[in-house]
Amino acid sequence: MSRMTAVRTPAPSDRPRLGLRERKKIKTREAIRTATYGLIEEQGYEATTVEQIADRAEVSASTVFRYFPAKEDIVLTDEYDALLVEDLRSRPADEPWLESLRHAMRRAVGLGMGEEQEVTRLRCRLMAEVPAVRSRMLENMSETGRAIGEAIGERTGRDPESLEVRVFTMSLVGGLMEVSQYWARTGFRDDLSDLVDRALTVFARGLTS
């Protein structure tokens, strides 16, 4: 694997400029993530400690934990969930729901592969190979599903906490997690956007030929 480049937080150009305090927080967060990915690349996930991450990022260990409650969160946390939900809410009201979802997912994947391709692959590989990372991802799925469910509720007029919406969103999030692991286990040979499209087609049509 080539040396990791610095992790960048995607920021739409139409958003107002952040204040100095917020920019410093983002810079610290990115420094911690970049340090983590670099250390994992060099010595592996299990050998990488929070103390080493803090030292390389030039912050204290307590600062690392203030931004990320656990080491697994450093690997898993990104800004694409929020962008995905934002995209879903901005799609035309008369557009079929799955088409809106397909569009938003393509954009999220495109941003991840365009700006953080190495990081995206490493994250997926760790989810497939490291039980602690995979377990933490499962814990985080409910929060992601709830955010998507709220967007679905706005579009459909359904209660986001209804059984039907929860089943749909958690099935979707679980399916996308499986896409990530499948991609890693097959050596990243397929285009990730194509795999996401295939998964969404299963949601639309079921296991039909």
Task: Cite the ranges covered by each PLM segment.
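C-terminal peripheral helix-coil segments that are non-catalytic and often amphipathic
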Residues: 1-12, 188-209
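Basic, helix-initiating cap at the start of DNA-binding domains
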Residues: 2-43, 47-62, 83
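Short amphipathic alpha-helical segment with a characteristic S/N-K-E followed by hydrophobic residues
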Residues: 32, 70-75
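Residue-level detection of the helix-turn-helix DNA-binding "recognition helix"
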Residues: 55, 69-70
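Base-recognition residues in the alpha-helical recognition helix of bacterial helix-turn-helix
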Residues: 62-69
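Short secondary-structure transition hinges
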Residues: 82, 118-146, 158
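Hydrophobic alpha-helical connector segments
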Residues: 86-123
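Hydrophobic/aromatic-rich alpha-helical bundle segments in the mid-to-C-terminal region
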Residues: 138, 154-200
